[in-house]
Structure formats: C-alpha cells, structure tokens
C-alpha cells in the first residue's frame, strides 16, 4: 500500500503522442461523450486494458493447468464484474471480454447515461448537472461524471430531490423535456 496522500496516475498516456489517426478518433470520442479532456479516454482505455489482461491470464491458466478451482473462481469474478456493469451479457464467454471496446466503457459512465435517459440536453450539460449536484442515484447525490453505473443502479438515476431541477415547473427542466419530445 502506498502513501495515502500521494495519488497515482490511473491512466497511461499514448506512446505515440502525435499519431494522427489516434488523435482524430479521440477527438470524435470526446465530442460524442462530452469528455473534458483526453485523459478521460485514456482512463477508460486503462480500465479496459486491465479487464483484457485479466481475461488473457485466465485463458492462459486454463490452457496450462486446466479448469482448476482457482481459475474458475477468477473467471467467474471477472465475468461477474463485467456483467454487473452491463458490459457483458448473461451468457458471455471469456472471448467476449477481449472484444470489448472503449466505447463500451464510456457508455456506462453516469454522464452518458444521464444524457441517454433524457435528463440533459447534451453530454456537456449532463456533466454540468452532475458536478453541480442535480443528479442522484437511488436518492444519493453523485457528483462524479465518470462514475461507472451498474445495471441495478441505472433505474434509480433521477434529479436530486432538493435540486431546483427536481421541480417540474423549472424552466431548464421544461426546455430539456421539450427538446426530447
């Protein structure tokens, strides 16, 4: 365990900083998902990288030692985690983990789900509503746009009870509803 006051990087920057195709694809992702900067994409890439490496480890353990209890437990843990977040279906295999994309991770962020549910007019506005404390999950205020929403929590996303947007007569809420209609 490290020093608690010293935060560590949760992402790794790309090896080729000025690769045109990567920069263009990151720009499209940043616009589509309303991300603040490229580090958010790199963080999602790092999460995906960890899941993929875990899947490769399990596949390697399966091929070398077979279906040992430790291998089965690790596989079930990995698949269960990804199923809980809605990244894999109920009958998913280990190969499905290797085929996940960064977009799949970005789709499970609170910011994206708030926008997709129609609680905001744009991904940028969804981010602003979250950081200003207008969004709650199951009645609990959440102010982190990058929060990974599980399938169980998705139905509980709504405006915070004491928020000004909690009132249906609010002007901004009316504009949001009119745009969706």
UniProtKB/Swiss-Prot annotation:
Q: What is the lineage of its organism?
A: Archaea, Methanobacteriati, Methanobacteriota, Stenosarchaea group, Methanomicrobia
An example GO BP is:
ribosomal small subunit biogenesis
* InterPro entries xrefs: Ribosomal_uS4, Ribosomal_uS4_arc, Ribosomal_uS4_CS, Ribosomal_uS4_euk/arc, Ribosomal_uS4_N, S4_RNA-bd, S4_RNA-bd_sf
Gene from which this protein is expressed:
rps4
- One CC-aspect GO term: small ribosomal subunit
Note the SMART domains from the entry: Ribosomal_S4, S4
User: Which UniProt keywords are present, listed alphabetically?
Assistant: Ribonucleoprotein, Ribosomal protein, RNA-binding, rRNA-binding
Quaternary state and interactors: Part of the 30S ribosomal subunit. Contacts protein S5. The interaction surface between S4 and S5 is involved in control of translational fidelity.
**Family recorded in the similarity comment:** Belongs to the universal ribosomal protein uS4 family.
Please provide, alphabetically and separated by semicolons, the GO molecular function terms listed in this UniProt record.
rRNA binding; structural constituent of ribosome
Residues of the S4 RNA-binding domain: 108-180
* Protein name, as recorded: Small ribosomal subunit protein uS4
Instruction: Tell me if RNA-binding is a UniProt keyword of this record.
Output: yes
Coiled-coil regions in this chain?
Answer: none
* Entry function: One of the primary rRNA binding proteins, it binds directly to 16S rRNA where it nucleates assembly of the body of the 30S subunit.
